Every structure is written in structure tokens, then in C-alpha cells.
Amino acid sequence: MQALMEDSKIKEEIWIEKYRPVRLNQVAGQDETIERLKSYVATKNLPHLLFSGPPGVGKTASAVSIAREIFGEDLWRENFTELNASDERGIDIVRNKIKNFAKTAPIGGAPFKIIFLDEADALTADAQSALRRTMERFSSNCRFILSCNYSSKIIEPIQSRCAVYRFRRLSDEAIKERLEYIAGDQGLSITEGGYEALIYVAQGDMRKAVNSLQAAAFIDTDKSISRETIYRTTATANPEEIKNLIETALRGNFRIARKELNRLLYEEGLSGEDIVGQIYRVVSEMDNLMVLDLGLTERDIVALVDVIGETDFRLTEGASEKIQLEALLAHFALSREN
């Protein structure tokens, strides 16, 4: 009965929401940025902000935390709205949703309202121009927090009106510390290999790490969560398998490498883009011992990265996964003869 209750708890709760930071000091791995944001909260004097950085590093959590701390738990929802620009990329999101919220007065004596626009780099150039005009018009009673993956995709007139903060990819230590807290709270047992796999899969993305942990916990409810469980539930190849695939091809054993590739594609169900991404990670992170053992030069590594990039581009353009990946392995096998 207890096991069933715990299993039901895992199913019902969404951990990325349950464990989302609600205060700035709970945001992991962005200490310098968070300290600067705290100064705005302390004075309740907030400029327009632009948060730039990869997914899952605390941009949204920071925006919500700012609203909670400035307005308080009773009023923050009335004075804060969150919109996702990737849902509506055009000018209508500015003309309708943003303007309708911005033109109303703050509630409960709040000094201003906050509009959080996530994935702002998805907005078209016309929509960004309209947003810039809206920011100017309603600056007396509204503050904008824009979030994006690439600040270069935000037009200069908007960037110049914002204080820009760059959120970096989270360290392995920051991710592990948070996962250990969640595991303790949920009563989970995770092997050291399980933590290593979660960190590998996450690639600095806390959201992905927590989602991966919950998916694994749903499967292994009665035992320790292992490395194998993480890779299986996230459709990720074991890095050692990818490393062996590359070494086999580079040693000229093309047919053996192709057989392993087919296993990853058809038995493990991995996508071609995921495999290429993992191949790139192994090649770009090769240690000196592996390079010497395979007899590779710096020029060889450059050539391998170049052909990996070409393969990745072709896959995104819709080319056959099997043909492109086999061609990639063939290039690896032939590289030793050139």
C-alpha cells in the first residue's frame, strides 16, 4: 500500500513546478547575477531587464521570484503576467495581450506591474519594434523582463533600454546539489553512476535534469536509480557506447561500427540528431590519451568536427538518418587512410 501511495505521488506531482525556486536566493548556480537582482528588489526600483542564456538555468524562476519579493505573496499574481513569445510570434501579441495588461493601473498600491516575456527572441522584427514602442509608452507603470536564448536576436533599441544579464550554463556541482535535495525529499536512492548520467543528460539544464530524474523515479520506484535507468528513460546512448562506436570506425572497422549504429537506431530507438550530438560531444572532448592512442593529429580532429557539423545540418534539412550516419562513420574510417 505504501509503495502504491508513493507511486501515485510521483505520478501526480510535476517536480519542476514543485521544486521551482520562489525566492532569488534559491536560484542555483547564478550567484553574481542573483546578487545584482537582489539590489533591485531591496529598493523596489526595477529597470527593464533582459535575461539571456540557455534553457533551464533560472531565467524564468528569477523573473517570478522578483515579482514575488517586490509585490508579496498576496499581490504578485495580480501585478505580474507571463507570456511566451514562441506561441505567438507576430505583432498581435504586442497589440493585444501586452498592451491590455500594461495600460491598466497596478493593484494594491504596487509601484508598477511586471510583464515577463519568455523566448522574446522568437518575436519577429516588426513585433520587436512594436514592443519597443510599448515599453516606452508604459514605462511609468510597467516594467518588462524579457528572456531569450540569444541576445543577438533582440533588436538593439530594446537591448539599449534594458539591463542585460547573462545566465550561464549550470555547473555539474550545482545540478547535483539540487538533485540530491530532491532525492532526499522524495526518499529516492540514486547511485553515483545515476547522478553522473543525470548530469551528462542535462548538459547544464536544471529543468532537464529534474524531469529526467522524475521519469526514472516513475520506473524504478523500489530500487536505486542507476546509470542505465537514466539513459533508458531519456533515450540517450551510454557515452561509452558512443565512444566505442567512434573508436571502431576510426580504426577502420566500418562494418562493425555500422552494425552498432543500427542497434542504436533500431533497437535503442535513438534519433539520428541525438546520436550526432553525442558523437560531437565525444570528439570535441577527446582527452590526449585517446587522441594519441588513435594516432590522430589536431588537423584530424578539426576535419572530424567539420564533417559532424555537415551531417548535423543535413539531418535538420530532412536527409535520411541511416544514410547520413553511415556516411559519417565511413568518413571516420577513411580518415586514417588520408
From Swiss-Prot:
Molecular function GO terms recorded: ATP binding; ATP hydrolysis activity; DNA binding; DNA clamp loader activity
Keyword Ion transport: no
Gene3D superfamilies: 1.10.8.60, 1.20.272.10, P-loop containing nucleotide triphosphate hydrolases (3.40.50.300)
Binding site for ATP: 53-60
Keywords, sorted A to Z: ATP-binding, DNA replication, Nucleotide-binding
Any one GO BP annotation for this protein: DNA-templated DNA replication
Stretches that traverse the bilayer: none
Top-level taxon of the source organism: Archaea
Pfam family, one: AAA
Statement: the UniProt record of this protein carries the keyword Transcription: no
Assigned GO CC terms: DNA replication factor C complex
Family under the similarity heading: Belongs to the activator 1 small subunits family. RfcS subfamily.
Main function: Part of the RFC clamp loader complex which loads the PCNA sliding clamp onto DNA.
Identification of the protein by name: Replication factor C small subunit
Source organism per UniProt: Methanosarcina acetivorans (strain ATCC 35395 / DSM 2834 / JCM 12185 / C2A)
